[in-house]
Amino acid sequence: MTSSVLIQGYEEDDVLKLLQELLDAETSQSCADVGKKIAQLFSNDNPLVTLKTTGFLDGLERAARNKKSGFHREAAMIGFATVIKNLGTPSEVVFLPYLPTILDSFSDRGEVVRQAAKMAAQALLDCLPAGAVETRLIPSLISYLDDSSIKWPSKVAALQLLGSLASSSPKAVADYMAALIPCIKERMHDTKPEISRAAITCMLNLCSVVENNDIIPHIPKLVDCMAHPETLEACIKDLSATTFVATVESVALAVLVPILKRALAQRSQSMLRLTVIITDNLCKLVPDPAEASDFLPELIPDVERIAQTAAMPEVRALASHALTTLNKAAAAQAAKAANNSEKQALDSACKELREAVLKNTSVPHELANSIIDYVCDALAALYKSNNFDKDKWTSQLGVLYLSPLVGEELASQISSKIYDDLHAFYKSLNSVDGISNLTIEEEELVNTDFSLAYGGRLLLSHTNLHLYRGHRYGVVGHNGCGKSTLLRAIGDYKVENFPSPDEVKTCFVAHSLQGEDTSMAILDFVAQDKALLTMNVTRQEAADALHSVGFTAEMQENPVASLSGGWKMKLELARAMLQKADILLLDEPTNHLDVANIAWLEAYLTSQKNITCLIVSHDSSFLDHVCTDIIHYEGVKNQAKKLGYYQGNLSAFVKVKPEAKSYYTLTATNEKFVFPPPGILTGVRSNTRLILKMTNASYTYPNAKKKSLDNVTVGLSLSSRVAILGPNGAGKSTLIKVLIGEVIPQEGKVFKHPNLRVGYVAQHAFHHLDQHLEKTPSQYIQWRYAGGQDREVSEKESRKLTEEDRAQLQRDITVNGERRRVEALIGRQKLKKSFQYEIKWFGKPHKYNTWVSREILLENGFQKFVQAFDDMESSREGLGFRELIPEDIRAHFEDVGLPGDIADYSPISSLSGGQKVKVVIAACLWNNPQLLVLDEPTNFLDRDALGGLAVAIRDWEGGVVMISHNEEFVSALCPEHWHVEAGKVTGKGKTAVDDGKFEDLSEKDLKKIEAKATKKKKLTRNEIKAKERRARERELAWLQSPKGTEKPKSFFSDDEE
């Protein structure tokens, strides 16, 4: 140094004397004591500058590389360790360039030097902030390992240091995996066994940051495959047996792509086939093209070559399919990369920072530039991770590192200016076109920026939640966008920076009671609620709240299990009222509510002036009547999701965004459902012939005082379009259950065509799926229809054998004068207008099997066995038209609006409510049913899906019976109404359907339909003769009948009139 630098009264020579004292110390402890004295000296002034300008660090480096004195090398390492440990952050800026010197000391012959080097490396690692690990430490270690002149003990130390980062800085490791994997993989094949073993251990540690649950079980085999290429084939087979359903991010790709690339270079056609399938499946699960930007270029050339040159046609086809998927992802990534405005903004901000600092600092520019580079790298890392915590940008980064150069006040100004510029740029880049900037002078409840993710999927990215007291917000967006997840996150206080429960109290209201079987009395259920007990809500207050929503004193003593879906929802609302929430979160509140109760709910919500409501509902009229504002899930330029705010109800929102018209018109939708044609029913030539009929049926639930159904007679044909209407608890769902055989009436009969297949979607539709949440939708259908019959039907309560049924099998029946015992029904064939069944008799070989008519079996009490056999035969007949293979199942799901990738790869547990309903609808249609029974089908479906379902039902040729409180849906589809009240059913004839609900039918189309309905087919000459002959036969039969038999008005049948 040419001039002395003053440090709190010390000249440069004094610093160098202390350095010499450190080097001359006789013991390790003495070295440490001198090191502490030196650290104290520098901490009193400006360590970022003085450590370098005094020559202290250069002196330590010279001592560390002194080949003649082991004492000096040990003292230098102790000096590094002690000074780093005592100075801490931000001194790492000037110490990081000396990391190679510290690592070199791991190869020293002296054990004490190696131990001191270990202390120095650990001290440096401990003082590094998280951002520096990614921006400086990992690149330094990779560069160090790539240096072929480095001795093997130092490389082992560097590998161990890298491996330790997986636990201390997992995010930094995950972000840098694309560069780490190739570096460590090369070291795994080093000729020095010590380096190879250390690299394998390091790789296992690094791979522990992978969070993909599909890949985690395979990590040991994947690492072993990297180390031992001969295990490649076994590894690929192991991967091919895995169903990938979790989101695939860059860290998982970093591990898999090197192995896939090597597999794509093999000659084995079987291995190539498996590899392209894995590649295709993985790429479909990459949510963001940026995640794959470092890997796609590596795979595309190999997959393209296989698509053109593979020997097997199947492999070429699979490779072509995978190439299409890769190209789509690559195109999206290229489009995003083409927009380099972010890089330009960062470069501009760093240039501005550099100019401002260099203009106002007296520190040598070489040193100042090294500190500025460090700060710029850290700022860029914060920006790329979307971290806009102003304190981190200014106090914890800008002021901390720049104040030694320009003073604290100016450093704060510079860093704040950079933060404001980049934050404003980020907001403009991620802004949503058309979002209304609401300025409301009312009490503000919540105003916070946040992001929302579900599993590995980003639903909302750096958006704003802005709520005012007394406003009622309708949250709208397509199925699966995350509406219910947002409400749950708010209810659980998991939204970033959301006010605490002491400031803002939230209450989530959903269908959580559905499907529960509890015998607790309704009043006890509410009074013993844990949340209400903590609020000291009295039993009388609970009773009053229940009474306010319609529960009489008598009803409050009934068990919860006796309530219909609508009454359970009202029970939830009563609990919410008692919690006195500031924010009421309503997820599909109108599901299962009848018209009267919906009107009550509308009146209640609009009367609450101090409660803010967030409502997710697919009932457009409800949102119109209740909402003061609309929150819309908006797509933006870079495919992130934001919340857009619009004043007014749904009608006002549609005026601003015409593309949202599907909220009003059923066919103004982008979603299309196509139902498979119904199967042929043997012996049914007319669409008006009854195929399912209930006669004088009555049903009472166990322990219930009143009949749910009382002497009901109804019938259905292939042309039926029936809506079952009535208040909550009237018995609508019970009517359906009795009609389709879910339960057996205590009085009366139910006739069902033996070959009739019924597709049934229950009110609690999810109960079909509750036992299969780990399966994908495709796997669920494969399970349900494996073996040639519908397992859901065979598992119904009405199909399970009771003790009485088992006793029935032990009874003998008389056939052809002989008493025999039925062992099984094994066949069926037509017998006149009925059927006869082949019986295997107990204790007799098959050659003694006989055919017994359906009527005899029913008279002898074998109804359940006959019905089960009919169900099996009809299901087998329907499944004869389909192959239970993944390709057909995928196409079937796509026909009902569920994307094929979700059907193949997503577990049912991860699906939204609307997607689960689509799974249930698709599953019940798989065996081509002739009758579709829908209990509340509109629940959980968004407007697009609702429109698609309505059009599919309209165009379907089978019979349909449904329960729905959605008047718009019912009036558009069902000309026949059955009104249920107090167990009685009143049929109201066929009224005209409201075709105005469908925009895709023009006036010309409607005239064609009308003409088609009225046009009668002209009979041929032979058909006229046959008609007259049948009439004469009927007349002769009447003449031969007993005296007094009433003469028919006509001898022609109804079909022949």
From Swiss-Prot:
ATP 1 binds at residues 477-484. Keywords: ATP-binding, Cytoplasm, mRNA transport, Nucleotide-binding, Nucleus, Phosphoprotein, Repeat, Transport. SUPFAM superfamilies: ARM repeat (SSF48371), P-loop containing nucleoside triphosphate hydrolases (SSF52540). One of its GO terms (cellular component) is nucleus. The keyword Cytoplasm applies. Residues 1020-1036 have a biased composition (Basic and acidic residues). Its main location: cytoplasm. It comes from the Eukaryota. Residues 1020-1057 are annotated as: Disordered. ATP 2 binds at residues 726-733. Residues 440-659, 692-1019 form the ABC transporter domain. It holds the Pfam family HEAT_EF3_GNC1. Residues 820-869 form the Chromo domain. The keyword ATP-binding applies. InterPro entries: AAA+_ATPase, ABC_transporter-like_ATP-bd, ABC_transporter-like_CS, ABCF_EF3_subfamily, ARM-like, ARM-type_fold, Chromo/chromo_shadow_dom, Chromo_domain. GO terms for biological process: poly(A)+ mRNA export from nucleus. Belongs to the ABC transporter superfamily. ABCF family. EF3 subfamily. Has a direct role in the mRNA export process. Appears to act within the rae1 mediated mRNA export pathway. This is mRNA export factor elf1.
